[in-house]
């Protein structure tokens, strides 16, 4: 019930206004968000790479309904990618892109998002790195996978995210478990109806393991996005005889575990930055009770 309430709050303009106006919120947000500027993001990226971890950067923003904002997001990614190359970080730092941030919600959104994603992929290719398409709520899944297919004709290294809580995802994993494919498997963090998503955690966990087996048995590059100790152990066992896979974890979550895993496995940190942090932040609170406890404890003790 608490998770449902928090996910509802993630889409509430009134809740957003209240949280963003609270002076004590921003210092806590910085546990999960690198900062507001590209310089903030570059500094944290360099530190993470120096610790033996790779990075995927997310310029925060979603559900854009203004063409100028979508264009600004593309420009921000192009600037970021140029700077990653200039600072020698591109070999270990890619970007993650939400299609709703680059025009998917606009009229003729599939075309607009594809054109803008192409521009970002071209900038990534010039920088010597890659792009992963983030997955959002289930209404965008088909459109996102359609854009993925189009992009991979010119940029075969483009990755995608699949969410284990959706009932369709095991088949999507089968469809994408081919040579050259990069798939980030996560559990999912949006409020979804039971008609399309498993409502119980135990069902989501079982789905995650089924999907993980499909990806590990396939010819692609699995990207195992989880903080769950049980899923980490299962992934390590399933992947022990193959080198071409990685763990992915969120910035600010289980840092010590990230460092431990990085001693024996490839680990990539999902690193968001920018001013549009509200939706991302609230979904992180909803995912793990420990995150919410940290937030409330920080507010009380400041």
Name each model feature, range by range.
Residues 1-302:
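Positively charged, amphipathic and often flexible ligand-engagement surfaces
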């Amino acid at each position: 019930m608490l998770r449902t309430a928090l996910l509802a709050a993630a889409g509430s303009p009134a809740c957003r206004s209240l949280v963003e106006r609270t002076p004590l919120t921003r210092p806590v947000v910085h546990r999960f968000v690198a900062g507001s500027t590209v310089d903030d993001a570059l500094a944290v990226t360099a530190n993470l790479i120096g610790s033996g971890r790779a990075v995927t950067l997310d310029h925060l923003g979603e559900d854009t309904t203004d063409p100028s904002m979508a264009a600004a997001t593309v420009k921000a990614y192009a600037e970021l990618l140029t700077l990653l190359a200039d600072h020698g970080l591109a070999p270990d730092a890619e970007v993650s892109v939400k299609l709703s941030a680059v025009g998917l919600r606009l009229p003729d959104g599939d075309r607009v998002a594809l054109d803008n994603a192409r521009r970002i992929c071209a900038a990534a290719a010039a920088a010597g790195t890659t792009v992963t398409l983030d997955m959002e709520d289930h209404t965008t899944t088909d459109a996102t996978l359609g854009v993925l297919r189009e992009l991979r004709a010119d940029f075969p290294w483009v990755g995608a995210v699949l969410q284990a809580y959706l009932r369709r995802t095991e088949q999507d994993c089968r469809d994408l478990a081919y040579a050259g494919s990069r798939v980030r498997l996560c559990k999912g963090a949006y409020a979804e109806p039971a008609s399309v998503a498993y409502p119980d955690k135990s069902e989501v966990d079982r789905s995650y393991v089924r999907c993980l087996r499909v990806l590990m048995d396939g010819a692609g590059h699995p990207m195992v996005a989880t903080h769950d100790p049980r899923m980490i152990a299962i992934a390590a066992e399933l992947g022990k005889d193959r080198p071409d896979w990685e763990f992915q974890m969120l910035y600010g979550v289980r840092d010590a575990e990230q460092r431990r895993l990085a001693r024996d496995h490839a680990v990539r940190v999902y690193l968001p930055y920018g001013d549009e942090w509200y939706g991302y932040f609230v979904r992180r609170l909803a995912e793990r009770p420990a995150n919410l406890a940290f937030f409330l404890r920080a507010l009380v003790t400041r």
